[in-house]
Amino acid sequence: MPNEQASEGDSGAGLIRGLGLKEAVSANVVEMLGIGPFITIPILIASMGGPHAMLGWLLGAALAICDGLVWAELGAAMPGAGGSYVYLREAYGPNKMGRLMSFLFVWMIFFTAPLSVATGAVGFAQYAQYLGPEISPLATQFIAVGLCLLITFALYRGIRTIGRLSFILMLIAIGTILWVIVSGLGNIRADLLFDIPEGSFSWSWSFVSGLGGAALIGIYGYGGYNNICFLGGEVRNPSRNIPFAVIASIAIVALLYIFLNTTILGVMPWQDAMASQHVVSDFMEIIYGSWAAQVLTYLVLGASAASVFALLLGYSRIPYAAAKDGRFFSVFAKLHPRKRFPNVSLVTLGLASTVFCFFELGDIIQALIVIQIIIQVLGQIVAVTLIRKYRPDIRRPFQMWGYPVPSLVALILWLLVLVSTGATIVGLGLLVLACGIGLYMLRARLVGEWPFGQPIGGP
């Protein structure tokens, strides 16, 4: 059938294009509406010390929209499995610097993919404590490990089944947030919502740093709008569906987050919300009592598990794309013989994520964002311009609105987020970058690739 053709060649041996528009939007929204908004609200408020920390969600939304347009243009132009791996390779030259950039991206994935999955799993385990007696940190970490393994098992199946499951999980996640919003709308108090401490808006480094920290948490909450780009080889009509899925998912989630935070800060004093470890459950307990808080907690845990599901689904396609291209270990190019999904890549990243479950949640989030900015995000913003100027052979069915303004705004906001994290975390990100460059140069020297030579038949 035309809707289920293989994405590579006509042999039927490649990935299956089994995701339509509905499933594409679902794959993004499910990842974005994970545990993030439920566990990061207190961290967001603490970053600026008051309800004006809502600016973090607004700044995060602006950054997501501008960066989302970068993803939409690149995703529509090069809709193969692997996302950024393909974009960086083609933009910087497939037999020149593109080899280094695409290698660095795959190198980064072996840090950011497990880090991303671990944030959802650790958040799940921490939030689950609302339902029972307090447990030790070690027990919490092992609950997170168990979730990683369970999700890996759940993903060990064909893409059409996963697409339908993603849509169901999206409905659960959206329903959970809508219940919170509707429950609180009639109870919002303006005096709580605008209880902003005196002197909060002073244009000092402290304010800028706090705003950058709030934006970092905000963009973490929006993370996932690019998920469908990593599944580009499995999307039907990708030149249309990928840009639409990116933009629609950001719009849906931005509205939900802004209403969610307005509702919570209008019902709970911001000091109480900042101190809560289960802020949404505490909110529902204020409105309805403990029964509603417990029901909501189960729904939050379901949304969290759904996010981990979507994260691991998207990331597992990246080592596959690199290995199939001959740029990574060939074992990762293997597909399941019957259901045709990258089983080796999936299992490897699923197991690797269990290691990061033993780190602190805040440290995981910061490390994740910084490594992504340094290696992937900045290189990809430049990639849009490089393709427009030097690769007229690449068809661009979707073009960024108002180019180059969105890409420049995204660049400035990402740099603001980067400098607000502090020298230690940025230094660790640069260390990961340096190690990746060193590994690439060693490999390139051994096999005679750029910059030491050209592959046979290369330009």
Question: Predicted regions: what is each one?
Answer:
Residues 165, 331-341, 377-426, 446-457:
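C-terminal membrane-solvent junction of multi-pass transporters and transport-like membrane proteins
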Residues 1-51, 65, 69, 96, ...:
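Membrane-interface "cap" regions at the ends of multi-pass membrane proteins
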Residues 139-194, 205, 223, 246-250, ...:
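Membrane-interface loop-to-helix entry segments
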Residues 10-15, 54, 135-139, 168-297:
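Helix-loop-helix junctions that connect adjacent transmembrane segments
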Residues 86-94, 129-134, 200-202, 245-312, ...:
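TM-loop-TM module centered on a large, flexible mid-protein loop between adjacent transmembrane helices
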Residues 18-28, 54, 62, 94-110, ...:
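Select transmembrane alpha-helical segments in multipass membrane proteins
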Residues 43, 56, 65-148, 153-156, ...:
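Hydrophobic transmembrane alpha-helices that form the core helical bundles
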Residues 176-180, 319, 368-396, 433-452:
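Hydrophobic alpha-helical segments of multi-pass membrane transport proteins
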